[in-house]
Amino acid sequence: MSVDDLVVVGAARQPGFGEIDVAAAARELVAGLVAEPWGQASASIYETGRLVSLAPWLSGHAARVRFLLAAQRPDGGWGAPDGYALVPTLSVTEALAAELRREAPGFERDSLAGVVDRGLGLLRSWLNDERLPSLPDMPAVELIAPALISMINGYLGENGEWLNLPAGMDGAKLSAVRARLASGAAVPQKLVHALEVAGEAAVAAPGVSPSPIGTAGSLSSATATIGASPAAGAAWLGAGEAPEPGAPVRRYLEAVVDSYGGAVPCALPITVFERGWALSWLRRAGIPVAVPSGLIEDLCDALGPEGSPAGPGLPSDADTTSVALYALALLGAVREPDCLWLYETGTHFCTWRGEEGESPTVNAHVLDAFGEYLRHVPGPAPRYEAAVDRLTAWLRDHQRVEGSWQDRWHASPYYATACCTLALEDFGGKDSADAVDRAVRWVLATQREDGSWGRWEGTAEETAYALHILLLTTAASGERPMEAVKRGYHYLRSSVSDQGVPVVMPPLWHDKDLYLPVAPVRATILGALYLAQGALPLRGE
């Protein structure tokens, strides 16, 4: 690779004693974006359960069952705390019940039955005894939960038992989706990601077309995905006889399974999402990193009239599009963000058209894209300038009383608060100074005794978001809270390897299940380490 093939950003700084060579780690991360063009995301308990149930013919079946058995919590459930556990617990309980009913389950029957019974016991407590924690705003939960409960009730009904639906759910939306699919009509692309909820209507549904994967690296167009989802792909293929090995959707499933060793993520490929987030976090922190020109060209090529989806099989969305545009601008490849106007509503920008709900982080990312574009545009751009004013006001109005933001795409308020605070700091003007100060005060007030930050416990990811807020904003006093930064840096340094890889990386991002996008999170952590190393008065502090 020649010098002309690279775009170098940032200025080099030599690491001191005890520090991580962040620039070297960033180079390795960027190389991984090229080497793994589908992206890297954590395995999903929910999605893996669906493959156990829907595709016992798929290679790696026994490994998937073992993955699920090992992940059961002491209380009988699966997944993260609070209401996040409902969907994975339903998925695994149904999957292992289906495994028990097979003639040759391949596992010790009494042990498997005990695992299922513990899962059912917790589900009865949640759903029939009304002890279910409040449910988070997760994609398709209003379809997934009724579908899985109906399947489990099919087993329980033989003994005169059943599980109730969560409060506020009646299954009407699920019935409508299934009826539409059965009619042969096309369905919105965002629903295809959760096609498995449709049951028999999903099998070879005429209104659903596989999406070829062939635009990145050497990937073959003979590989195709259904909604970028292994579960959706398995549902479309059906649970009967195994399809031909060369069938494009089966090729996709086999490729994912082979890459992960059995268990599967909720979504793959996530090419544009991963690259946009990772590169923008690295660049915003000022890390010196060489970005191959081909990577930049791929991001440019991904942007069409409607923007870009996170990956093949998913709908285009304002979040992926705005982050890609922002990353490109930071890398010197400025594009007019006019495709984002498609997502403008009367008050804000939606993730996709027809969205039920609203997202502060999506609007913060649109503000980043518009604001960075205005820094480069040679003349007046009144429409963009007016949108920046509206977005900053909208974000300020959605700040919580204590100074944080919450969002529908991440479990942690530290992610949402970092996105919104940094956008307002950079592009919100003087009118946003108070909102930024309130966010900083909230971050300082919620630091844990060990120097970390986190919703349920301290994590490297959430600590990194907090450090970005403290180090990339200017307090009203003009001073930075360096004692909090020092404590946060000590925690972060002790939580990662010498290459800046977190020892523990819990999934905190919202999809059908919580997931971890590896490269974006690692980029955020590297950015925080780099900023802290530059700000602390003594190397190694």
Segments (PLM) and residue ranges:
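Buried hydrophobic core positions in alpha-solenoid tandem helical repeats
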Residues: 29-33, 68, 119, 123, ...
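Short Pro/Gly-enriched beta-strand edge/turn motifs at strand-loop
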Residues: 32-34, 214-220, 506-507
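Nucleic acid-processing catalytic cores of prokaryotic defense/repair systems
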Residues: 73-78
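Helix-turn-helix repeat elements of alpha-solenoid scaffolds
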Residues: 22-27, 335, 343
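An alpha-helical repeat/solenoid feature that recognizes helix-turn-helix modules
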Residues: 1-21, 36-63, 80-110, 125-193, ...
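Edge strands and adjacent loops of beta-rich recognition modules
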Residues: 192-217
